[in-house]
Amino acid sequence: MELYHLRTFVTVAEEQHLTRAAERLFTSQPAISAHIKALEEELRLTLFDRTPKGMQLTPAGRQLLDQAQRTLATAGDFLQAAKGMQNELLGSIRIGLNTDAEFLRLVELQAGLSAHHPQLGIEFLAGRTGDNIPALRIGRLDAAFVSGDCDEPLLESHILREEEMAIAVPHALRDQIDSPDIRALARLPWVYTSPSCAYYQLMQPLFDAHGCKPVKTMLADQEDAMKAMVAAGVGLGIMRRSEVEAAERAGQMHVLPMELPTLSLRFAYLRKRTNDPVIRAVVAELSAIWGLKDLTQREAV
């Protein structure tokens, strides 16, 4: 049995699909199938049921999954400890994104990591807060940018900044708003987000507190789509204040004069990986980029 057999087993269990597992491991589907077959033959156990819905773990597979994950983690720690003696950080990290690269300062992050850890591979994967958190839990991501509260017991998170939010108003609806009254705003059309989005979790309690529901004309979970729909007059939307103000200066929309709660931008990862050298390296770079005290020297929140 080789470590790559265990890595394949864990990846197929997470993805529940041979093709997706092959893509993650940068290999072919036949190679993935061969690894699973060899492992099952050596263990004399059936690890997966092949179903129309994908690869489902058998009871034996479920029992062995946690042990396989721990074994891989231990092997990774061993390798990093050895490389640490050589002052060289090897490996790779998959970081989930939840907004645009400029706001997250990804160019600076990539430049810093490349300068200080040239052997470290970095993957930036586009997503949303609502997708990134479960992806962290199952190991599909190593770390992620998320917005809002992060009270997941398995995760650590560091606040990078508090972002001011604002309600963006299309030109066509501006004259229909006499004052920033929540009940009156709820009667207007809205470009809304899904419940897993941090923007939804920020805005919905304001409507709930006044016993009203907004008219949801369209769903848009991507910020560029939200901005385009508001500019097109589809409805009101919630966006970062800096973006709405820039769009207002460009004559695309208006900022509603109403104070909203701020939204935390966080960097999150599994709590058990707090001392992982790769995670610590990224957190140290973020500390420098965002002008924060060294986040590796204090507890996460």
Regions found by a protein language model. Give the residues of each.
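Beta-alpha-beta core module
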Residues: E152-I159, E163, I177, D224-T274, ...
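Secondary-structure junction motif
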Residues: D175, P189-H210, N275-A284, L292-R298
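Hydrophobic hinge/microswitch elements
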Residues: R128-I133, R137-L141, V146-S147, S196, ...
